[in-house]
Amino acid sequence: MSTAPNKQSALKKITRGLTVGTVITGSTFFHGPPVLALGLTKLFKKSSKIDETNIQITNSWLGVNNWLIDHVLPNLKWDISIDEDLDLNMQGRYLMTCNHQSWVDTTVNQYFGLTRMPLTRFFTKWELIFIPFVGQAFKILGFPMMKRHTKEQIAKNPELKDRDMMEARKACEQLLSQPFTLLNYLEGTRFTQEKHD
């Protein structure tokens, strides 16, 4: 009995994984610093041109991710329907709702939205701010970043209940001066049968 096909398959998966990891890391280190640098300049001078440039850089960043999906994961099967009568454009303002099934949801929305509508921002956890470049880009690009508080924390400090709402309003006000797509996972967390029951 030969194990050659299994070794070849395992080697192919490892090579693909290394390729994806290398390209994503390289793209992050290429696109992340300019987004951060432009974001810092906004502290001193507000400018729609800075926002537009940051969006272009971010779309390029997402374009690299989409290239990976198309070329490194070519056997991927999509089962997605987009209403042909839906009139989307890059200058629009959209509110999108979605059931949060897995970490792939955001990738799929970014993949299909990249050339159809403005950059999709979504409500995200504050803890992601600590991911180098990515977390800071979320903040700079106007992604509403929510802190999760337990019932006990809110009971001790009732002001915490309204803090996320104020952060969401602030992020949404920042988006008003530009085209945007705001994605909200209404249940606020990934779906599991346990949470559903």
Can you say where each PLM-predicted feature lies in the sequence?
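Membrane-anchoring hydrophobic helices of lipid-metabolizing enzymes
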Residues: 2-95, 108
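Soluble catalytic domains of membrane acyltransferases
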Residues: 72-197
